[in-house]
A protein has these predicted regions:
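Carbohydrate-active catalytic/glycan-binding domains of CAZyme proteins
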Residues: 1-299
Length: 299
């Protein structure tokens, strides 16, 4: 009897479960935001990033940076563990990247995350994830940074995750993971196109899903140009949700064809209590990512 008990305890799965149970009693796996200056995607280094951690009752994720009147603002998803419903807040930073204010800027009765920001014809817009409301919703900024009005639904009757817009080749392109009922939201990337970001007539790409791969499908931030090449950040969810960042070069983008190649990966380190990272955004000299970090529960 004693021998059988010892044998069971030594099984890897059971040992792992015991270890995780002990860890979860003392530590919290918390999404946090990290900022750094003048870093492109290939120069990312954990040692050069400064962590901004929320209180222990919530997490911060999906940071998007905006520069307004020479001051940096970081729009992020905040989620209270007690409600499990995300909303959008904005951190206002001083010149030394200290947080001088923190305010809720958009909240709904349903979950919001991934506050994708873009400017069109002098107007600032936000395209947050609104999958829980079964459509892709666009918001217009009426007073920066904390007043946003609903503009329109770009696509109805769709469970879209991490919608990401790009203007290129005379069109506007909308990248998003589409989650079917009961299915995964990690491994299929769909593409839509229109003549304007304000259109409500988005044409599905004929090759949808354009990426079918848990390693690189799900968007991870704004698509950007580096050395003349279009780079699409994506999540590597092969180990777990949002485990690492991939950077993929878009080599073909037309109404009939799409192709991309993997360029670079940025993984969590093997030390320091950093377990995952799944968002990258960089604008005007400030880079923002997020990370799951182990935090002592009894601070």
């Amino acid at each position: 009897m004693k021998k059988n008990l010892i044998s069971r305890l030594l099984k890897p799965r059971l040992l792992s479960r015991i270890k995780n149970k002990i860890r979860s009693f003392f530590f919290l796996d918390q999404w946090t935001v990290l900022l750094g200056r003048d870093m492109d995607h290939k120069a990312l280094a954990w040692s050069d990033l400064r962590t901004f951690a929320p209180p222990l009752d919530r997490f911060w994720a999906d940071p998007f940076v905006w520069l307004h009147e020479n001051q940096y603002y970081v729009f992020i998803e905040e989620l209270l563990y007690s409600t499990n419903r995300g909303y959008i807040i904005c951190l206002t930073l001083d010149k030394d990247l200290n947080v001088v204010s923190n305010q809720v800027v958009l909240e709904k009765p349903y979950h919001l995350s991934y506050p994708f920001l873009f400017e069109h014809e002098g107007q600032l817009y936000m395209l947050p994830e609104t999958k829980q409301n079964n459509r892709v919703e666009l918001y217009r900024c009426v007073k920066f940074p904390d007043q946003w009005e609903f503009e329109k639904a770009l696509i109805d009757n769709i469970r879209a995750l991490d919608s990401t817009l790009l203007e290129a080749n005379g069109k506007w392109w909308l990248f998003a993971n589409i989650q079917e009922e009961g299915g995964s939201g990690w491994d299929t990337l769909n593409l839509y196109y229109a003549d304007s970001p304000l259109s409500d007539q988005w044409t599905p790409h004929p090759l949808n899903p354009i990426v079918k791969d848990v390693y690189s499908a799900r968007p991870a931030g704004q698509i950007f140009i580096h050395d003349g090449r279009l780079i699409r950040p994506s999540q590597d969810c092969s180990v777990d949700y949002g485990y690492a960042l991939n950077f993929n070069q878009i080599v073909t983008l037309t109404e009939t064809d799409y192709a991309e190649t993997h360029e670079h990966v940025f993984k969590p380190p093997l030390k320091g209590g950093i377990l995952a990272t799944h968002t990258f955004n960089s604008i005007d000299g400030l880079t923002a990512i997020d990370a799951i970090q182990l935090r002592w529960k009894f601070e």
